[in-house]
Amino acid sequence: MFNIKIKRINNLAKLPEYAHDGDAGMDLFSIEEKVIDPGGVALIHTGIKIELPEKTEAQIRPRSGLALKNSITVLNTPGTIDEGYRGEIGVILINHGKESFKVEKHMKVAQMVIKPVLKVKILEVDELSDTQRAEGGFGSTGVK
C-alpha cells in the first residue's frame, strides 16, 4: 500500500475517503456552495493539496450517481493530477441537465483514483507493425 500526503488548506476541507473496501476511487468533497446552471461549468474547490508517490498520478473522475440523477459530470474526465503538482485539487464540473444544480458544502463531487505512470522512450519510425485491426476505429466494429 502506498501513502499519500494530504494538506488541508481550508478548515472546511474533508479528507478524501473510500466509501467501501475494494473501491478504486476515493470521494472528493466540496468546501463551498455553488450553483451550476444548465450548460454551465464551475471549478469546485476541495481545500486540499496532495503529494503523490513517485511514478503515480491521480485521476479525477465523475461520480456515477451525480451523472445519472443530475446530469453532472467532470468536464475533462479523467482530470490528471501529476506527481509534481502541489496546488489545490479542483474539480471542473459541467451541468448537462435542464435544471440548475446546487453543489453543497461537503458534497461528494468526484472520485480520485491513484494510478501508476509508465514513462516511455519515443522512437520515430518509418513503418509500424501490421495488426488485424489496422486503422479500424470510430465504430468500425459495429454496435451489435
From Swiss-Prot:
Metal-binding recorded as keyword: yes
Pathway: Pyrimidine metabolism; dUMP biosynthesis; dUMP from dCTP (dUTP route): step 2/2
Gene Ontology terms: biological process: dUMP biosynthetic process; dUTP catabolic process
EC number: 3.6.1.23
Tree of life domain: Bacteria
Residues given in the record as substrate binding sites: 63-65, 76, 80-82
Record-level Gene Ontology MF annotations: dUTP diphosphatase activity; magnesium ion binding
Cofactor names: Mg(2+)
InterPro entries membership: dUTPase, dUTPase-like, dUTPase-like_sf, dUTPase_trimeric
Gene3D superfamilies named among the record's database cross-references: 2.70.40.10
Keyword terms of this UniProt record: Hydrolase, Magnesium, Metal-binding, Nucleotide metabolism
Reactions listed under catalytic activity: dUTP + H2O = dUMP + diphosphate + H(+)
Function: This enzyme is involved in nucleotide metabolism: it produces dUMP, the immediate precursor of thymidine nucleotides and it decreases the intracellular concentration of dUTP so that uracil cannot be incorporated into DNA.
Family label: Belongs to the dUTPase family.
Protein name, UniProt field: Deoxyuridine 5'-triphosphate nucleotidohydrolase
Species name: Alkaliphilus metalliredigens (strain QYMF)
Gene: dut
